């Protein structure tokens, strides 16, 4: 096989240490030379690792994406001008029965040396930092949804079926009623009806029927209040994250506005997309490769004339849900009915 990188390095990364193997292939021989060294993952030792690589004129490094342990190594080497390829572990998996830390780094380096390692997409630093915020926002929104469900279930077990009447348990009328039910006041039907607003006043009888016979212990009231406070706190944190994100994406406003011209994409979706794939689409080569990277394309798995599972992959953990949400919104878009007419 052709040697793509005459001088390169394979790195096996762990939580507390890494093993690096520099591979040098002489011009007059296909037999490579190996130099191995072990470093800790403290910044001082990572800089020594970078010094060692530069001393041997090794500017191409490959390591597998082991958890988050590769990130500090990548940060240091990137700052020192060393090109780092991050590989999916499934592409550099060592042969069973012949595996240890030293052999792993050598194996990774050997595969990389002859160009058999596919590089994972690593955006620039600004996009990576933005990605940390958007992914954290995704987690906060998930937590908020969990608290909403927990709040609703807390009333269900207390024989309150208000969620069967109102569309949103956190709407103005529903909030007023739930606050009243968890207060120390004795229940008064007339006062409860007076808390209803707008269209919900027409459902006053249904609201009372959904509440009639409820029983909430003091301990349950305390738990419900804690859940609400946590929900409100999460909402505040989401607003704080949004403020910070809007400051960070100021330089990408043109890209965001362009994305928002696509049916189904709003500002939040556009920011999520940019945070996941950046703004330079040359990284993917084609739209098909991008869809595959996002985990939206079916697999191709056939052996001996039998087709096996072709389900979509687990890739695109954060991008895929955003694009699926965009697709649902596009189908319901009345202003741009192309997808609505095509798929509904």
Task: Say what each PLM segment does.
Residues 1-344:
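A detector of single, family-specific signature residues
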């Amino acid at each position: 096989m052709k040697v793509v990188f005459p001088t390169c390095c394979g790195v096996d990364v762990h939580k507390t240490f890494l093993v690096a193997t520099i591979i040098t292939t002489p011009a007059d021989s296909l037999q490579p030379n190996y130099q191995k060294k072990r470093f800790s993952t403290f910044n001082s030792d990572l800089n020594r690792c970078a010094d060692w690589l530069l001393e041997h004129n090794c500017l191409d490094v490959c390591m597998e994406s082991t958890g988050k342990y590769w990130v500090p190594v990548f940060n240091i080497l990137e700052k020192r001008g060393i090109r780092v390829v991050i590989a999916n572990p499934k592409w550099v998996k060592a042969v069973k029965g012949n595996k240890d830390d030293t052999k792993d780094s050598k194996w990774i380096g050997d595969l990389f040396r002859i160009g058999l390692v596919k590089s994972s997409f690593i955006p620039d630093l600004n996009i990576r930092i933005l990605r940390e915020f958007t992914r954290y926002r995704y987690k906060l929104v998930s937590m908020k949804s969990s608290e909403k469900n927990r709040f609703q279930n807390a009333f269900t077990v207390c024989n309150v079926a208000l969620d069967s009447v109102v569309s949103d348990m956190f709407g103005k009328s529903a909030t007023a009623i739930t606050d009243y039910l968890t207060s120390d006041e004795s229940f008064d039907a007339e006062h409860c009806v007076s808390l209803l607003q707008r269209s919900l006043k027409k459902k006053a009888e249904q609201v009372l029927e959904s509440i009639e016979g409820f029983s909430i212990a003091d301990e349950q009231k305390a738990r419900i209040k804690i859940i609400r406070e946590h929900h409100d706190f999460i909402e505040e944190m989401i607003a704080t994250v949004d403020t910070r994100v809007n400051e960070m994406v100021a330089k990408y406003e043109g890209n965001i506005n362009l994305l928002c011209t696509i049916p189904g994409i709003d500002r939040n979706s556009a920011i999520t997309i940019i945070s996941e794939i950046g703004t330079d689409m040359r990284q993917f080569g084609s739209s098909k490769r991008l869809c595959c990277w996002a985990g939206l394309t079916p697999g191709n798995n056939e052996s001996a004339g039998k087709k096996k599972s072709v389900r979509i992959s687990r890739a695109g953990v954060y991008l895929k849900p955003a694009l699926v949400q965009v697709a649902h919104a596009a189908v319901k878009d009345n202003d741009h009915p192309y997808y609505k007419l095509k798929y509904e």
